[in-house]
Amino acid sequence: MGNVCVHMVNNCVDTKSNSWVRPTDLIMDHPLKPQLQDKPPQPMLMNKDDDKTKLNDTHGDPKLLEGKEKPAQKQTSQGQGGRKCSDEEYKKRAIACANSKRKAHNVRRLMSAGLQAESVLKTKTGHLKEYYNLGSKLGHGQFGTTFVCVEKGTGEEYACKSIPKRKLENEEDVEDVRREIEIMKHLLGQPNVISIKGAYEDSVAVHMVMELCRGGELFDRIVERGHYSERKAAHLAKVILGVVQTCHSLGVMHRDLKPENFLFVNDDEDSPLKAIDFGLSMFLKPGENFTDVVGSPYYIAPEVLNKNYGPEADIWSAGVMIYVLLSGSAPFWGETEEEIFNEVLEGELDLTSDPWPQVSESAKDLIRKMLERNPIQRLTAQQVLCHPWIRDEGNAPDTPLDTTVLSRLKKFSATDKLKKMALRVIAERLSEEEIHELRETFKTIDSGKSGRVTYKELKNGLERFNTNLDNSDINSLMQIPTDVHLEDTVDYNEFIEAIVRLRQIQEEEANDRLESSTKV
């Protein structure tokens, strides 16, 4: 029985035909979508991951939906297309497909300000503030804001994600919120998956109370610890694929797997790593395929861009994560979304340049099988967990990885954080006139008219407004990490557009807080 492998509750006898079970449809949250060519590109930094819930293990009787809603059927279609993109016409067709606008909802618009208290969850939940005190803000995104909240009866801390009803523009948006809660309820108690404590609704918002994770993000923990080997990477990969296998076996597809959506519960060395943010997740029927383009550019599967995909797309995303864990860089890279998508569709997988010569052949074999462009030939989550490199008794070496991997991981994480910090601080502190002036400053710096400036130029441009940006956030912002190459570039038009969008979100949040304080 040498090749028998057991993981959690399932053994290694998986096939494509019996892997996926359970109900229905689709989840929401204005997924990251590339824009049409005649519109300003939308920056990746404002994806839904900004709404991360820094989510601590706790238990209790969750106050959830009493009855399961029967989700509406999503348009599904023919079997999975396994063809590689090999000609220019096919590639352009796929890119155009990914760049298409989201279809307009064919339903009546709701007057969200007038929604009754039970209109979303369809059950009386009581008011959040009867049971919890709200604390500091943890993060925000297009649909909601996450706060620390403290349970009045126990003093336990949780994370509370509040979704204003005015952002639920139609019946489908309301269904999506119900389904996100239902999916978290469906996964309740599963290891390495964030737990939901309860759901509440008032006349202004829907509130999801979840466990609070204070141990930080996946990449930050790796860099902080300093000691990093293939065996450690294999252990982390096993946790990630264990989450995927658990979700798939319960008929759920995550659809937004990436390092930012995995958080440690606490700072302990053996802290559990948990998957968070199921806002784009969906229930799945056997053989069901989906057509909406969702996810994050570096981690998106080619069949998602082709608008015909199933749970195999989660395996691709997890494969990209393992590639980054072992090399510190993304396998398919570009300076714009379109360049990234081109690489995802037909770029060559690099497993030969540094640091790959020092990585084991077993690890590279697994990555090739997970980043197989034909989803029919791609490994399932169960098969990945049975691969020799990832098993507990497997062959992942315990020798340290090349030091460049850690430095690349640090840069990979720090660059994204720099952009997000700059966006948030600028949007909070600069007037519209100053933001316009900042754009003109970048245009002056950009003598080659490339539309891009280096991080050093970005820093210098921001320093002109230092009188308005005089706080601890800006001090941190101006201390660009040494691991972030100052000659790397950022698209300043994307940067400015993201600032404008973030200002709108912040103004809306202020209005929501005012409205919520006057209503119970």
UniProtKB/Swiss-Prot annotation:
Autoinhibitory domain as annotated region, ranges: 396-426
Gene3D superfamilies with a match to the protein in the record: EF-hand (1.10.238.10), Phosphorylase Kinase, domain 1 (3.30.200.20), Transferase(Phosphotransferase) domain 1 (1.10.510.10)
Domain EF-hand stretches: 433-468, 469-505
Domain comment in the entry: There are 3 contiguous domains conserved in the CDPK subfamily: a kinase domain, an autoinhibitory (junction) domain and a calmodulin-like domain. The autoinhibitory domain (396-426) inactivates kinase activity under calcium-free conditions.
Positions annotated to bind Ca(2+) 1: 446, 450, 452, 457
Reaction equation(s) it catalyzes: L-seryl-[protein] + ATP = O-phospho-L-seryl-[protein] + ADP + H(+); L-threonyl-[protein] + ATP = O-phospho-L-threonyl-[protein] + ADP + H(+)
Residue ranges of domain Protein kinase in the record: 132-390
Lipid group attachment sites (N-myristoyl glycine): 2
Protein name per its UniProtKB record: Calcium-dependent protein kinase 25
Organism of this sequence: Arabidopsis thaliana
Domain of life of the native organism: Eukaryota
Regulation: Activated by calcium. Autophosphorylation may play an important role in the regulation of the kinase activity.
Binding of ATP, residues: 138-146, 161
Region described as Disordered: 31-87
Keyword entries, A-Z: ATP-binding, Calcium, Kinase, Lipoprotein, Membrane, Metal-binding, Myristate, Nucleotide-binding, Phosphoprotein, Repeat, Serine/threonine-protein kinase, Transferase
EC number from the UniProt entry: 2.7.11.1
